[in-house]
């Protein structure tokens, strides 16, 4: 994953295709149960090659996240030097149609944060 402001990043954003590590502002409704609701920030986990089909695999970013914090499924953004703050809830992975949900690009997170999130998601699958 390239750093913020890289040529790859600008091209992907210009094409309107999010890439792994991008933060999007997106409408998460409709939701059920404990799923995060309304217009929220999400971290894109899937690569641009997949996302070009109109779907993204994401984890929500929240200011709460009690369960995620207590059980090791939270990655904090507080010391990441990013505009987006809160925690990435690694246990609430979902696939979204970013075009239909009116997603807008916010920023790209540092590679070490994205790698930490991916590692925690993998523990759910192993």
Where would I find each of the regions flagged by the language model?
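Conserved functional hotspots at enzyme active or ligand-binding sites that engage polyanionic ligands
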Residues: 1-126
């Amino acid at each position: 994953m390239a750093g913020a402001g890289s040529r790859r990043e600008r091209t992907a954003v210009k094409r309107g295709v999010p890439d792994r590590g991008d933060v999007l502002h997106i409408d998460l409704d409709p939701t059920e149960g404990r799923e995060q609701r309304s217009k929220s920030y999400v971290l894109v986990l899937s690569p641009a090659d997949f996302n070009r089909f109109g779907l993204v695999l994401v984890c929500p970013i929240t200011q709460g996240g009690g369960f995620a914090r207590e059980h090791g499924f939270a990655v904090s953004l507080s010391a990441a030097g990013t505009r987006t703050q809160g925690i990435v809830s690694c246990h609430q992975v979902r696939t979204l149609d970013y075009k239909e949900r009116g997603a807008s690009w916010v920023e790209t997170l540092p590679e070490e944060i994205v790698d930490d999130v991916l590692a925690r998601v993998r523990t759910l699958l192993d």
